[in-house]
Every structure is written in structure tokens, then in C-alpha cells.
Curated annotation (Swiss-Prot):
Pfam families in UniProt: SmpB
Similarity-based family: Belongs to the SmpB family.
Primary localisation category: cytoplasm
PROSITE patterns (UniProt xref): SSRP
Name this polypeptide is given: SsrA-binding protein
Biased composition (Basic and acidic residues): 138-160
Function description: Required for rescue of stalled ribosomes mediated by trans-translation. Binds to transfer-messenger RNA (tmRNA), required for stable association of tmRNA with ribosomes. tmRNA and SmpB together mimic tRNA shape, replacing the anticodon stem-loop with SmpB. tmRNA is encoded by the ssrA gene; the 2 termini fold to resemble tRNA(Ala) and it encodes a 'tag peptide', a short internal open reading frame. During trans-translation Ala-aminoacylated tmRNA acts like a tRNA, entering the A-site of stalled ribosomes, displacing the stalled mRNA.
Source organism: Azorhizobium caulinodans (strain ATCC 43989 / DSM 5975 / JCM 20966 / LMG 6465 / NBRC 14845 / NCIMB 13405 / ORS 571)
Amino acid sequence: MMAEKKKKELPRKVVADNRRARFDYDIGEVFEAGIALKGTEVKALRTGKATIHESYAGGKNGELWLFNSYVPEYLEANRFNHEPRRPRKLLMHKRQIHKLTVAVEREGMTVVPLKIYFNEQGRAKVEVALAKGRKAHDKREAVKERDWNRDKARLMRDRG
């Protein structure tokens, strides 16, 4: 009898986080998407120096693409390296892509990436969300509300 090999469970490692998106947008429905990468991009992502704070997703020919995301060049790749700001294809079901593109076209919403991470199987995933842009006064209101909730929690903790 052969012993079964146990697959090594990798923890979910967040590579890039778009914290600014939660401040600039009202986040709606969140989706998980795969991302089509080249080999050097995967290795560069594992170093953890990618940024997505200025990136967005958009539909093109029935496909969803991630634009303006920055994955630095992999130092050991020499001439076979990738372009750091190239558009990257997001892998989702057709129904999900259709839902996102309809929301963008009809309701004026935006598709923003929230984070890039490696799942338990070691595959790169992108968490994208439907979002509506906030005005300056909405941002101030959100900050006030967050501060009030923090003060309220502090008071409840001290009293109770």
C-alpha cells in the first residue's frame, strides 16, 4: 500500500491591499476573481511589492481586465521579464462579468480591486468590488461616523 501524500496547506497570504478604496468608494458586492499572470509576475508578486491603489477593472470584448496595477519586474528574470503596468485578464464566470459590466454601464458604478492574495492552493486571486464613488462631503461624514463609533465603543468598554 502506498501512503497518501498530504498536500501542504498554505496560509492565505495578502500581497497587495487597496485600503484607499474603502475610503474613496462605497463598497457594494464583492467578488473573487482569478488573474492571468506570466511566470515572472507570480514570482514578483510573492515578494509582496505589488500595488493596486490606482488600479481599476473594466470590461473589453466580454472579458474583464485589471488596468494600471503595478507588479514590479522580477530581478532574476533578465530579458524574459514582464511589463510592470500591463493590463491583466481577470478570470470570472460569464454571468459575473455580465453583472459587473451592466452595473458599470447603467448605474455608473466602478469595479475596484480590494486586494491581491494567494489562496490555500497557492493561486493568485483578486478581490474586486462594485463601488460607487464618494464626494468630498461623504468622505468627511464617513470619518466622523467612524470616529463616533470608536468613541462609543471606548465609552461602552470603560463603563461596562
